[in-house]
């Protein structure tokens, strides 16, 4: 199944940050309650890697208020031969 990296940024002020984290945790969603956070290092964002059929399906994991601002990237892997041979890179 395809894997997707999801990044959702939020405002850095204390109230906005706290509210954002509370909304994620209150959903009870396994994905959201296990998100990685950068807030304590000054990077106000949540990161999640999930399996989904499409970017659109991955976006639905997020609370509705944050879906439109999320960055979603399809993940892939490469074989060494693909990179060493400078051939057309195709994910496997």
Predicted features along the sequence, with ranges:
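Conserved, structured core segments of small domains
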Residues: 1-92
